[in-house]
């Protein structure tokens, strides 16, 4: 009941089973989702719209064990990033840029940047 109340008031959905370290910080938290088996280290920062979720099993099979990612100490994950899977680890002091989509691990001290295609404007 408390989880649903907190979600309705903040727009942040953190499963009560998530393992969260000290000094966890969410800035502009609307749309943040943290799954049940997520492990978050100390001094981690998340920004709006970040999802730490599970990959969907094939064929509707139920998956047991760790299904959500691990975020190690000192990592920062920027707006709109989606990180999925129980084997996915965001290494210590890494930075995941906005709108990244990850299903594989990131080594410690890595910067993940998504480069958008060029945007052009033409007169009508």
Question: Which residue ranges define each predicted feature?
Answer:
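Regulatory activation segment
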Residues: 60-68
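Terminal amphipathic alpha-helical/low-complexity segments used for targeting or macromolecular assembly
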Residues: 1-10, 124
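Left-handed beta-helix
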Residues: 10, 15-16, 21-22, 27-36, ...
């Amino acid at each position: 009941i408390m989880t649903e109340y907190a979600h309705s008031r903040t727009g942040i959905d953190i499963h009560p089973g998530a393992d969260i370290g000290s000094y966890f910080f969410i800035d502009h938290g609307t749309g943040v989702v943290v799954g049940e088996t997520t492990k978050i280290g100390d001094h981690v920062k998340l920004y709006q719209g970040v999802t730490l979720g599970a990959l969907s099993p094939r064929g509707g099979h139920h998956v047991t064990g760790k299904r959500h990612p691990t975020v190690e100490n000192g990592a920062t994950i920027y707006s709109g990033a989606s990180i999925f899977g129980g084997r996915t680890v965001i290494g210590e002091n890494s930075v995941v840029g906005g709108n990244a989509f990850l299903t594989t691990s990131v080594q410690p001290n890595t910067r993940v940047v998504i480069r958008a295609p060029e945007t052009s404007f033409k007169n009508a």
